[in-house]
Amino acid sequence: MKKLLTSWWIALGLISTPALANKGIAFVHGTGMQTDAYNDYWTGDFVHSVSQGLNDSSMYTVINCDFDQFMWDQKAAGCLAEQLSSFINDKNISEMIVITHSNGGNVIRWIMSNPTFDSRYPAIINATSKVIALAPSSLGTPLADAVHQGNVFESSLGWLLGYGSDAVKQQQVSWMHYYNQNFLNGTAGRPALAKPFKAVVGSDVDSAFWDGDSYCAGYQYQVALETTQNWLDSCSDGFLNCSSQAGAGTVWFTDKQRTRGREPLSHQQSRRDCFNLDVILRNDI
């Protein structure tokens, strides 16, 4: 009788235990055409550190697409959809966390907001558990306006934004307002996104040469972003106003609320392992 009961409880346990989710991470870069985003955009240190939050730290993919195009372009959202679909199918991913940076947040929002635009979109949305949007350009940036108009900042911003590409046009403030009002969900007055879109907001740039923290992710970039910050609000990461970064979904946190030493995250630093950002992401995963 004891053996019978034991067998019964074992069988019941096997039946009632839910299947473990096969969790994975997709790293989605920002503006620009990437062929090796693992090394050139994120760095292996950042990717590996964040991925330690997974049961299997090898279950990640790093996207390489042409985000110099409009977000809906086949080379942008189409490429992203193809690579995400392959990741989901090849690795049997049932719970995908998408980590985006800058304009990458707009491309994934396009997919989440327009499920009938491409037959691959619904499966991607279903597999996605949440989007962690690092410094997303949800409401655009005045710097895109300046670059598109041929301002003197064009040459100094090329490393960050590109030179007069469609993605630059798209991120002009008035253009993003139009897209948010008509094609993208998650902003004020629009339907909510199908899955959580958690924004991490960068609020300032430090470039003091005597401060070692200014050298994280490259001192020269900090100096450049400190300069461009003069065109932005007092709360900005050198490329985006805080209001733009907070414009879609919900704000998870503003840098100083959680970073080591309450350090700000510039637009360059918010895609690198600076001030425990990688650890914060890892723990959330």
Task: Describe each PLM feature range.
Residues 25, 29, 77-183:
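Serine-dependent carboxylesterase/thioesterase catalytic core
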Residues 31-33, 67-68, 103-105, 137-139, ...:
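Short, solvent-exposed loop/turn segments at secondary-structure junctions
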Residues 1-8:
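Bacterial N-terminal signal peptides that target proteins for export
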Residues 190-285:
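C-terminal catalytic-base region of ester-bond hydrolases, centering on the histidine
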Residues 22-96:
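Active-site catalytic motif of lipid deacylating hydrolases and related acyltransferases
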Residues 49-55, 124, 189-191, 249:
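Short, conserved catalytic or adaptor-binding loops enriched in Gly and charged residues
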Residues 36-40, 110-111, 142-146, 210-212:
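Short, solvent-exposed loop/turn and secondary-structure capping segments
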Residues 16-18:
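N-terminal signal peptide c-region/cleavage motif recognized by signal peptidases
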